[in-house]
């Protein structure tokens, strides 16, 4: 805002130009203040993967398992566009899903074994395990996918009553 005033609203500027530059600078300052005081979004309700917990929940509850890593740009893209906290809260509410995040930033033999068991070797991968006997055949979304593709995969689950 100060730079704008120095460039376009200085002593030599016309009255109309000073008014426009001042209004624009004020708008920028107010917008910056408003943006900075917005509350942080509630984080997504992910649980950290533990093989024993996963095995105990399988077949008993519907699960959505996300395989990710800090070094994976495609994973980060999905987190920012498809797997947003707002969408994940709505999904868990609608389907009663438990969300489990498998972090492969560091080697984890049990997590990598699960990744191979669903037929994948690379990430990102999201696997949806229905409740009951169908959990033996998870719905798998590989690489990049859209929110509508995720919704289509979830549509095979029964909404929570």
Where are these regions (language model features)?
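Proteins that catalyze or organize thiol-disulfide redox chemistry
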Residues: 1-161
